[in-house]
Amino acid sequence: METLKRFLSPLLFVSAALIFTSPAVAQSDDASGVSARAHAIHDSAIVIDTHADTPQRFLDENFDIGSTDPKDIGHISLDKARAGNLGAEFFSIWVDPETNQGHFAKHTLDLIDSVYEQAARHPDGMMMAFSTDDIERAHKQKKLAALMGIEGGHSIENDIHVLRDFYRLGVRYMTLSWSNTNEWADSSGDIDDPKIQHHNGLTDFGKQVVLEMNRLGMIVDISHVADKTFWDAIATSKAPVIASHSSARALTNAPRNITDDMLRAVAKNGGVVDVNFFSGFLDQKYWDASKAQAEAQNAAIHDYLEKLKAQGKQVTYSDEDRITRQWMAKIPRPPFTVLIDHIDHIAKIAGTDHVGLGSDFDGVAGATPQGMDSAADLPKITQALLDRGYSSADIRKILGGNVLRVFKEVERVSRELQAQPVQNQ
């Protein structure tokens, strides 16, 4: 979830025969420019996206993921997921730390409930998933596996017991911080703000949170965190970590992106960096233009939200998203190739075993690269990687195999740690 939620305020996959067919067959055969060979590879993969903010729409707009409305501008629906062979989605459980002061956990529960309700409403197309076995089961049943990740450690309200409860409710990763520094983890979003009390990374309690996540089998997510928090998390975690929705800082100099040294560290840790589709993290010109209009954009959002409050209306993410889209439309979208550039860079620096997809769908209003308008466009990534010489095996890893591997290892480490006595906390 990015500025398309105030990120700017802190300055934010038929047959084997087809896969190995001749180059002539690899020519484009559909309107989107995706070849039969690319479709065969894409459709044989378990495609996993590690970050989508669609629960905000479930809750604020009463959006139905089964919607077939052609006018819907959202990135994810069951039809769009099927069209893009999206096999598993980690739905982001993001609680705005400003508008939900005093009830972070309560709003977290509301968002979790919204995901369960969608799965209950569409049992033929979607199922809740809590493990790698569940993801593979959903794939065999041709259903979307719905997983959940908390975006921002403030949701646990500084309580290990709440963290455990969220795991019991199905949360399978947690981003240690969002764009706000919380009471135990520094964020990249406000690291330069002298008014914020920082901790030089993770506090002792923050390290305890990481270790408890390891014990539970909850993936540690280092997107959004300050650089020192990243290094503390890497040093503390006994299991592989992920960056659920981050890109390469060497290509786009944004604090939310990952440096090459960090990429190498994630590779050594066995983790995965899942590339964010937000244009500001993929294209330097877009990032710079975003920063240039940030003050005016934030003022417009503030004024609009205050107007709603004065009218006695409840302010929602969708209200802010409406204004954000208007401002993002002022900046030209970069070409689709910038997304592939970041995947390619991370693969070259960290290795093809350590890169995946973390779209930030439905959290980057109108600000994805040209040609990436919804989950239905995911096969274009496979075509682009094929065009750059990636093997079918490596493409399947990038599409989801790497995340599945990391999740399996997190589960293994959890079983090992749970054989040990539980400390009183």
Where are these regions (language model features)?
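Bacterial N-terminal signal peptides that target proteins for export
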Residues: 1-12
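A broad helix-preferring feature
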Residues: 3, 18-19, 220
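Bacterial N-terminal signal peptides
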Residues: 10-22
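N-terminal hydrophobic targeting/anchoring segments and the immediately downstream early-domain regions
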Residues: 25-197, 253-425
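Divalent metal-binding pocket/active-site signature
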Residues: 168-242, 247-256
